[in-house]
Amino acid sequence: MAPVIKQQDDLLLNLYIQPKASRDQIVGVHGEELKIAITAPPVDGKANAHLIKYLSKAFKVPKGDINILKGEQGRHKQVKVISPRVIPENISSQL
């Protein structure tokens, strides 16, 4: 499966999350997933909340337009971005 899939106006992202990183960044392709490093620890949903906030800024959409479809409790996640206004360059290259 591809790391980034376009579904009409939406994007489906297959992600591998690296929590407790030194900074927030989209690292690149990691196997068949897109690796994203975030600074938040994987405790009490903090990493998921931080990931949603980071992705909403990257795609310039409200936080409500970022949905974690699979992987709430793990590092491997499937996330849907509804009608992104901007697609970061390192993600658009995967389309």
UniProtKB/Swiss-Prot annotation:
It comes from the Bacteria. One of its GO terms (cellular component) is cytoplasm. SUPFAM superfamilies: YggU-like (SSF69786). Coiled coil: none annotated. Belongs to the UPF0235 family. HAMAP family: UPF0235 (MF_00634). This is UPF0235 protein Swoo_1329.
